[in-house]
Every structure is written in C-alpha cells, then in structure tokens.
C-alpha cells in the first residue's frame, strides 16, 4: 500500500516517514507548497490508501477532492505507542518510497526507490562524508525534497543529532540554531 505524507518539517514528519518505511508500505512524500493541480496529479499517479497530514492541509485535500479514495489520518490525533515487538519482513528490492520530480521540463514524474537503493545511498554518503554519532545536522531544507530527506536519513543512520527547521525560510532562526549547536 502507498501511504502519502503531507506534513511540514517536524518530529511528526519523521515519525510518520520512518513508520511507513518500517511497516513495509510505500511512502509518498508530498511537498507542503504543492499546487492544487500537482497534488491531484501526484495522488492520481501514486494511488495512496492513506494520507497522513494535519488539519491545516486537510482543507487543501478536501478542496481538491483528494480524500475520496483514501483514508485521512490526522497526525494531531495520533497516540504514539512503543511497539518494540513490531518487525515486518522487508524485501530489499521492494519499493520503499515514491519521490516526484520537480517537473521543470514537463509533468512531474514519480520515481520509485527500493529499500536497497535508499540503504545503499545512505551508506555511501555517510561513509564518504564520515558522518558519525558526534555530528549535528541543521536541516533547513524541506524534508519533501530529496536532499533534505537524504540529510535526515544520513544523520539518523549515523546516530547523530538532527535539528529540523519547520520554517525553512526563517534564516535568522537557522543561523541561531547553527550557533547554538
């Protein structure tokens, strides 16, 4: 099943993202700044059974009739529980996520990445950059963007610290967090 996530940079995004991946479902990340027409197109192509979002984006999803064929899960109503016995069987070749291209030359296209694609890339980047548990990554890019998501994946794999900015355009706040960390 495809599970779409429409959330800003936040701990809720991270929990949802890693939860979907670890559950064996396919994660489709929707940029929060997406246009109505692009939203409709991405949901038509990815065919999610569930959309994880919040009340802010529920209005956009309703306005575009995007909730007709899937279930809406409001992250604000979630109760997180420890399910340490949960261990799904993941096939390395199965699709882990669908990321859409920017569509600068034509209609955005969905790019399917397997668990092994993602794991290999994360391992290569963390090894090359020598990212460790002592590192702190100030993530100011949207997590819906492949580079922002890559930064999150690499720092989490390494056991380091991620400082995630919800407002990716608040430059003074980002500079202050760099100074603080």
Where are these regions (language model features)?
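Conserved AMP-binding/adenylate-forming
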Residues: 1-34, 140
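Conserved S/T- and glycine-rich ATP-binding loop of Class I adenylate-forming
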Residues: 3, 20, 51, 95, ...
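Conserved G/P- and acidic residue-centered "switch" motifs that form tight phosphate/ATP-binding loops
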Residues: 24, 104, 159
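ANL superfamily adenylate-forming
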Residues: 50, 55-93
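Conserved pre-ATP/AMP-binding loop-to-beta segment of ANL
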Residues: 82-100, 106-107, 130-136
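Conserved AMP-binding A3 loop
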Residues: 96-123
């Amino acid at each position: 099943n495809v599970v779409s996530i429409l959330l800003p940079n936040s701990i809720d995004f991270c929990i949802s993202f890693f939860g979907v991946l670890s559950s064996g479902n396919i994660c489709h990340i929707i940029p929060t700044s997406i246009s109505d027409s692009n939203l409709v197109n991405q949901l038509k192509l990815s065919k999610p059974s569930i959309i994880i979002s919040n009340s802010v984006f529920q209005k956009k999803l309703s306005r575009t009739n995007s909730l007709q064929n899937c279930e809406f899960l409001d992250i604000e109503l979630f109760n997180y529980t420890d399910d340490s016995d949960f261990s799904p069987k993941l096939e390395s070749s199965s699709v882990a996520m669908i990321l859409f291209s920017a569509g600068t030359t034509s209609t955005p296209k969905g790019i399917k990445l397997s668990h092994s694609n993602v794991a290999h890339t994360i391992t290569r980047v963390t090894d090359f950059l020598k990212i460790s548990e002592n590192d702190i990554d100030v993530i100011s890019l949207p997590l819906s963007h492949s580079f922002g998501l890559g930064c999150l994946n690499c720092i989490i794999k390494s056991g380091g610290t991620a400082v995630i900015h919800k407002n990716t355009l608040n430059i003074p706040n980002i500079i202050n967090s760099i100074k603080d960390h």
